Each structure stands twice: as C-alpha cells, then as structure tokens.
Amino acid sequence: MAISDQGQRTLSNTCFCRSAGATGVDSARRGFLTGAAALAGLSALGPTAGCASSATTPATLARTRIDVHHHFIPPFHVDAMMAPGRRTGARPPKWSPAMSLDDMDKSGIATAVLSIAQPGVLFGSDFAESRRLARELNDYGAKMVRDHPGRFGLFAVIAPPDTEGSLREIAYAFDVLKADGIGLLTSYGDKYLGDPSFAPVYEELNRRKAVVYVHPTTPDCCRGLVPGIPPGSIEYATDSTRTIAHIVFSGYAVRFPDIRWIFSHSGGTLPFLTGRFTRLAEEKKDPRLPDGPLPEFRKFHYELAQGNTPGQLDALLRMVSVSQVMYGTDYPFRDGAEVNAGIAAYRFSAADVRAIARGNALRLLPRLGPA
C-alpha cells in the first residue's frame, strides 16, 4: 500500500519517533525525541528502520529482519490452483527461490518463514488430493530450508477439515521435517477456525505448543459481491476478523492456550471492531470469556504486511502492545520495500523497530537465530 505524503509524518530534518507501550499508542509517546538515543542500533536494521538516514542505500542494508509472511509457489501448486473448474481467482505471480532470496537481500531480511497462500491444498472434499499436495509442498519447503541454511523457515500446510490427514501431517512436519509451525487459512468452505470439528487438530497443536500462522482467503460466502472490485480487496481483511473472533468466541483461545497464533495484515479489520466485540461479550455473558474478548485478542500476534499505513498501525497499537507485532512482507504479492517504508514512515522508536523486525519473532521461533 502506498504511504501518503501526510502519512510520512516528517518535520524538517527532525526525527519524529513513536514508541508503543503495553496499552498501545498514546499522546505521551508522540513527542519529539531528543538526542541520538533513539537511533541506537538502527543502523543494523537498514535505511528504513525507524529514524535511520534515508541516505543509506540498499547495498548497505544488513540482513537482520525475520519475515513471517513469505509465500512459496512452486509450479505444481500453480497447476493445482489453476485446474479447470476451480474458483481460485487470478493466476499467482511468478516465483522462484532465487526471486525470494533476491528480494530478501534487497530488503534486509535474514530469514523468511515460508507458507503457502490461498487457496491452500483443499479443493472441495478431495482429501486424497489435499494430503498428497500438502506432503509435496511441505517437502518442497523443507528442502528450501536445507538448501539455504539460515535463510528460510517453514510453516507447514495442513487441511483441518481432514482430521486424520492433518494429524498425520502435523507429526510428519514437526518430527521429520522439523518445521517451525503450521500454516492455516482463515476458512475452509463454510468452516472458520473456531469450528467444533477442528478440536482434535488443536489439541495436538496445543500439546506441541505450536506456532500457527493464519493467512486469509476469499470465503465461499462472499465472491463477486461488488462489481469491479476483486473479493480479496475487501474479504481478506474481513475473513481474518471473522476467524479471529470465531477462535475467541468459540472458547478455543482459552481452551488451547499454548497455541501461539500469528495473524496476517495487522489483524484485518479486527482492531477497528474491538468495541463491538466487547459489547457482544457483555451481552452474551459468556462464562468462557469472563474478562471479555480483548485479553484474548491481545495474546495473539499480528504481522504488518499490507497493514502498515499510519491509520492501520494506530488502530493495531491501541489493541496490542508492540511485543505482539511482527514483520511480514507478503512476498511475492508485495515486497519488502513496502513494509520497510511503512515502518519508517510511522517513526517507531529504535527499540520498537528491533522488536518488530526480529526480536518478537525470535521469542516464538528461536531456531531462526540469535537475538
């Protein structure tokens, strides 16, 4: 997303930094920072980190960032997506491992955690195909991790409507491939992630204290509603909100507290709707949410791909602390330059930039390297 001139928030040559604390952004944190303390350590994060000099060139950009939203799209997955009769939308962009590495190097990304994007591996109810495709994709991603030490991690794909196949693939992904987590979509047909049938899958993920990354999809309910506007332009953000709310209001967030969730695109529209969900919980008087939904929303993690404009960041940081925010690019649909520019325009403090770019991801994914 383009950042407007107004969103740059640049006054003369003075660096205007923000720091988000435990309860988000407030006016006390919007003042000018004096001295050079806010710049400490930013040079290692490259030209678009916090208040780093715009004179720095990409060639000097140290590789430090961890990208938790980075897609891999091998040719056999494209073939499956584009098979006749499938409602999978436009053909995905061209991709190769070399293209990923090139953008990572240009953007200062040390490690990208690979995941697949919509439409995933489940087409209709053909579990045999989804199992085969998941295994092929997970093996492909694991080979990239092995072939490029330190550069990639892996969120392995499963299809939760297939309980037996999912449990088998979870075991294979963690025990054989040593995957870093599991990647899910926001919905599967008419099932969102709070669906009762998914409980056995979550029991196993909770037992393993798994990291679960969730990517939006275009839901079956809402295709072609607005002429001339691709459904993903609206529905990706909305489907993320639906599934996050479903996880919380189903009781799964409380029932499975050891699953570490990461949601895409700054949580979609969720940060703008927390008041509505709080009132809903008060009206329902749900014993599973004695303190309302907000404490559960605040336990989750949110990455910034296509969610890094000033308005989006303001809303997100009123909902959660910076400790729950992670760096993501959505490559190859977007690139690292976009999110780097968004983070720089917001003028985070140096400490917050370090946390978003690397530190917060390492808390969940320590295998990816030293702090």
Annotate each PLM feature.
Residues 2-50, 57-64, 68, 74-111, ...:
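Mid-to-C-terminal alpha-helical segments outside catalytic/metal-binding sites
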Residues 73-75, 120-122, 161-162, 190, ...:
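Active-site environment of divalent metal-dependent phosphoester hydrolases
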Residues 116-244:
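Active-site gating/metal-coordination segments in enzymes
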Residues 69-71, 215, 265:
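Histidine-centered divalent metal-coordination motifs
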Residues 214, 264, 327-329:
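Active-site flanking residues adjacent to catalytic metal/cofactor-binding acidic residues
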Residues 10-17, 71-95, 124-126, 131, ...:
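Active-site gating loops and adjacent loop-to-helix segments of metal-dependent hydrolytic enzymes
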Residues 211-214, 238-248, 269-287:
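Conserved N-terminal glycine/acidic-rich loop preference
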